Amino acid sequence: EVFKILNYLKKKKINYLDTASAYNQSEAKIGKYFQKTNKKFRVITKFSFKGNNSIEKQFIKSLHLLGYLPDTILAHNYRDYINPKFHEQIKNIKKKYLIKNIGVSLNKISELNKILKYKKPDVIQVPLNILNKSFLDENIIKRLKKKSIRILGRSIFLQGLFYKDKKFVFKKFKNVKKKYMQLLKIASHEKMTLGELSLVWANHLKDVDNIILGVDNFPHLKKNLDSLKKRISKESYNLIKKINLENNKITKPYLWKKQ
C-alpha cells in the first residue's frame, strides 16, 4: 500500500514527504520505493537528542534507510535547536552532504522567540488548525517573512480530534463547547466534516508555504486530497478567523497525556 500511496502522491504532483529518524519503518519503506521506482521526493526529516545517538549518527542511519539525501533537516523541538551541539553537528552534515534547509518543529510562540534569538532557521514547522491560529498573528507573519523563514503547518486535524464525537471532546476538554459548536455549525453550513473544514481552510492560507498531512491508508489519503478541491465561503472564512482556543489545553496535544 505504501507504493500505491507514493505513486498517487507523484501523480497529484505532491513532491514533499515529512518523516523523522524515530519512524524507522517509514524511512525504510520510503527508501525501498526510491530504490525500486527511481521516483524521488523532497524529504523533510527530524532529529532529536533523545537517547544516546548523536545527530550525525541518526542522519547516517536515515540516509542508509532512505538511500537518498533529505532536502530539509528539522530539530524535533526548540530545546534541540538551541543546543550548540545540534548546530555543531548540523554544520558538519550540511558541509559534507550539501543539505539545503535547516529548521525546527515548534509548539508555541514563546519557543519561536527563543530560537530566533539563538539562530535564524530556514524553515519552521508549527501547529495550525481552525482552533489554533497563534502563528498566524499579523506581526509574527511579518517577522517571519522579513527573515525569509518558510512556514509549514502541521496538526491540521488536531491529532485526529476533529474526527472524534463531540461528546468525547466535551468530556475530555473544559470550556470548549461554545466555540467548538460554532465550528460544527460552520462545517455543516459548508457541507463538510470538521476535519475537512480545517484542511480546506489551512490549504488556502496565503502566508503558509506548505501543510503537512498524516496518512493512515490510501482511502484516507485520497479522501483528504479530494477535499482540497472544495472551497469555503468568504463569510465562513471570516467567522473561522474570529474563533480560537489557543489558550485551552485542547490545542496543546503535548499536554494531553498530563490530564
Identify the residue ranges that each predicted region occupies:
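N-terminal binding-site loop/beta-alpha segment at the start of enzyme catalytic domains
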Residues: E1-F41
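Short, acidic/polar
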Residues: E1-L9, N52-L66, N107-K114
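Hydrophobic residues in well-ordered beta-strands that form the structural core
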Residues: T19, I30, T45, V104, ...
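Acidic-and-aromatic substrate-binding clefts and catalytic sites of carbohydrate-active enzymes
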Residues: A20-A28, F49-S54, R79-P84, L131-F135
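Acidic (Asp/Glu)-rich catalytic clusters
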Residues: G31-K39, I60-Y68, I115-K119, L144-K146
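A short, structured active-site edge motif that brings together acidic residues
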Residues: K40-G51, T72-H76
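CE4/NodB-like, metal-dependent polysaccharide N-deacetylase domain
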Residues: E56-L74, N92-K96, K117
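Beta/alpha (TIM)-barrel catalytic core signal, keyed to glycine-rich beta->alpha loops juxtaposed to Asp/Glu
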Residues: N77-I243, I250
